[in-house]
Design a protein with these regions (language model features):
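Acidic (Asp/Glu-rich) sequence patches and key acidic residues
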Residues: 1-101, 112-125, 132-144
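Active-site periphery "cap/insert" segments of enzyme catalytic domains
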Residues: 103-109
Length: 144
């Protein structure tokens, strides 16, 4: 029996006031987001307010349409409401993406999954994998 190890990627839409910091020192944005992610006090007002300052909401309709238009002709892709799935047995990729108003969450057995590869074209998104200490900022200057 093969064990599939899934990675969880969180994608945030950065506020324009933090784009400069994300470009010059992305590790500081990662530290802020990780502190929000790891916050375990019962008072959630502090991390909620910090999150609202650093991140903008996700345009759910835009991202649903964006991924649908990109992947609709791929037989390995399915979508239901805000949940996008990709199961490719030839490349052994198993990926699931949930689009929320606060963030996008991708669970995948691959770091180079179909959703991250396609989302790189959208600017000002910050990607984190808190468990594996991974982060990346997709700016307007980013090209494959």
């Amino acid at each position: 029996m093969k064990v599939i190890i899934l990675r969880t990627f969180y994608i945030f839409n950065l506020n324009k006031n933090y784009i400069g910091l994300a470009t010059s020192e992305p590790n500081k944005i990662y530290i802020i987001l990780k502190s929000i992610y790891s916050y375990n006090d019962k008072n959630i007002v502090i991390p909620f307010n910090l999150f609202k300052e650093v991140c903008n909401s996700i345009n759910v309709e835009f991202f649903n349409k964006y991924f649908y238009d990109k992947l609709v002709n791929d037989e390995d892709y399915t979508v239901f409401k805000n949940i996008h799935m990709y199961h490719n047995y030839f490349t052994n990729e198993e990926s699931k993406m949930n689009i929320f108003k606060s963030h996008i969450k991708i669970k995948s057995n691959r770091e180079d999954n179909i959703f991250l590869l396609n989302i790189k074209d959208i600017t000002n998104l910050f990607v984190c994998d808190f468990i594996n200490e991974y982060y990346n900022y997709f700016s307007s200057s980013y090209k494959k």
